[in-house]
Design a protein with these regions (language model features):
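Membrane-embedded and juxtamembrane structural elements of multi-pass membrane proteins
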Residues: 1-185
Length: 185
């Protein structure tokens, strides 16, 4: 029990330290409109905050990228991902000893991003999807440790996300109806 408790403590302390570190980084950010802030000290856009989620954009962001990034981050807010991801991390911290929990948390983070991408691009043209994919690739973050709270634009499974974006087809009415019928049965 003490080893398990130490593991939980380490993961929760890591979360707290990460939170404080990010909070310090965005302290000097400038509000540009609504809940959107620009910051010189970050390299990738993300959402931060649980009670009052804010979108933080790096100052290096080009004007053509802003539209896609803000659409993506606003989709996270509408989906309440800023609440789900920390909750998932707490579950991960409690069940850290189970290797399937590590896998589940990684897949959970990937699925959050892919669901958000689908929500953003569902009515877009092929050209808009291509532009979105290029922006996503420009923010790809490689070799990162498991993150706690921020929902970063290029955080997880970029190759798979880009494939999903470029091959996305809106499901037909009949497919959705069949899936609902299957669930009822």
């Amino acid at each position: 029990a003490s080893i398990w408790l130490c593991g939980v403590a380490v993961l929760l302390v890591y979360a707290a330290v990460s939170y404080v570190h990010i909070r310090r980084k965005v302290r000097e950010s400038v509000r540009i409109e609504g809940n959107i802030y620009i910051c010189d000290r970050i390299q990738t856009p993300f959402i931060f905050g649980v009670l009052n989620p804010r979108i933080y954009l790096p100052s290096s962001l080009k004007e053509v990228q802003i539209k896609n990034v803000v659409a993506h981050e606003k989709a996270h807010i509408r989906r309440l991902d800023y609440l789900w991801k920390p909750l998932g991390y707490v579950l991960f911290a409690v069940y850290w000893f189970n290797p399937f929990c590590w896998l589940a948390y990684i897949l959970f983070c990937r699925d959050i991003e892919m669901a958000c991408d689908e929500r953003v691009i569902k009515d877009w043209s092929a050209e808009q999807k291509k532009e979105y994919s290029l922006v996503l690739l420009s923010f790809h973050v490689s070799g990162k440790m498991i993150t706690v709270c921020p929902l970063a634009f290029g955080e997880v499974g970029v190759k798979q996300r880009v494939k999903g974006i470029l091959n996305f087809k809106k499901p037909t009415f009949w497919l959705i109806a069949a899936e609902l019928l299957f669930c009822v049965i």
